[in-house]
Amino acid sequence: MCLCGTFGLGLALWGSCTSSGGKTETVMSDSVDAEQGNVVVEAIMSRRSIRKYKDQPVEREKLETIVNCGINAPSGMNRQPWQVRVVDNADYINGITEVFKKANPKAAEEPGFKNMFRNAPAVIFIASPKDGSGQLDCGLLGENMVLAAQSLGLGTCCLGGPIAFMTGNQEAASYLERLQLPEDYALLYAIGVGYPDESPAAKPRDAEKVKFVE
């Protein structure tokens, strides 16, 4: 089931607490017994950042579902201040990766390195207006997409490093141009998408940062 138009927090579903250095941390439970059967909560609580992917392409239909869920995110006054570009073209991904390797030769020496997008076979680029407006809305867009991907059995990882490289390296300019962004838009971040080849454990979440005000 796709989670179109969904943005939420599973604050009530944390598990046991651990203490480290006098600071109480709350660890998310792998189960969601309190909301068993709620597909939205389950997707939120089970989603992890994936950095290892299977050598398997993502079906175009699933990518279309993901971006459709993304553009159904809320935005201020429904301005929809985003530009979204989906790349599942291996020639593009491998080409920009070669430029990256030329500038960062040690990167190719890392075990299992295939491409600069954490080896994801598909990448979704998100751009926002250069004047700085719309970044919050683009964040909501991205959250919808990563949750939709999770519900479709896909893994994701939000990426900032490749964007810094693409916008700062002159040899990468041709790949940036191929995205055909409006002149008043700039890349904000990217999302790697693919079939996960790892199952990371949940990391601690600090419940002390959440307070109900009476």
Specify the residue positions occupied by each region the protein language model found:
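Acidic, surface-exposed loops and disordered segments
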Residues: M1-E214
